[in-house]
Amino acid sequence: MTKRKHVAVLLGGWSSEREVSLRSGNACADALERRGFEVTRIDVARDIATVLDQLRPDSALMMLHGHPGEDGSIQGVLETLAIPYSHSGVLASALAMQKDLAKTVMKTAGVPVAEGLTLSRDEIARGHVMEPPYVIKPVADGSSVGVYIITEQHQHPPQELFRDDWAYGDKLLVEKYVAGKELTCAVVKGEPTDVIEIVPMVRFYDYEAKYSPGASKHVLPASLLPFVYQEVRRLTLAAHVALGCRGVSRADFRFDDRIEGTGGLVCLEVNTQPGMTETSLVPELAAYAGITFDELVQWMVEDASLDR
């Protein structure tokens, strides 16, 4: 009798994206159980190295969002223990998590990025650092947590940035606000997917809009001119390769169609462990390509390796 493959699904953790990670991880664990895998769900804590060393699974499915699972830290633990894992490796994870460094790499590779600065909270507190509208966001967090859009109506940056309980680090990315359509595209099995346009029911595609059913409308395929559509796909793969990503990644874009050609297309960021909840974009893109949720999750596990 063939032994069932034992997969550890790493979920939870202690980042600001914990709740999303729990939802993603549990959905994937359920899928693997339906496919006949032996599954252990691990809510990651600071003793994760000891837990994994004792458990010794055949592989690990990474369903952590934010620190420490998306920044290369847990990947380093898994490599030390010689446990194959999914998604991107140590370097690509660390690089993509640091938005300022990732932008530099992508720009060098010919992927257009938003004009911006990396500043401390103290520097931002002195007043407007660029002409509004602009965006202030943490250098190393996802799911749009800690993100503020500063418009002409703001006399000064939001005071929440300077409170003692601010949890998103002292270093912040300040970027010129890019108007236009919100687009996303993923890389699955080494190829770019189709493109989704996200239409938030609120002004900004924030945490609530991303993870609350009905808070945003997804247009798939996105309503774009064919050459723009293909350019989004090309840039998605280019960003994935430039950062050294593996497995699944997702790139987010803005497109200002008032600018001629593809000049209004800007890559905002690349997510190395995109969400896998019921409202997440990657499962929707995969389904459009004929890949069921369970098939997608199984492929992620089968793709796991120590060569990331």
Swiss-Prot record:
It is found in: Cytoplasm. GO terms for biological process: cell wall organization; peptidoglycan biosynthetic process; regulation of cell shape. Residues 103-302 form the ATP-grasp domain. One of its GO terms (cellular component) is cytoplasm. Mg(2+) 1 binds at D252, E269. PANTHER family: D-ALANINE--D-ALANINE LIGASE (PTHR23132), D-ALANINE--D-ALANINE LIGASE B (PTHR23132:SF23). This is D-alanine--D-alanine ligase. The gene is ddl.
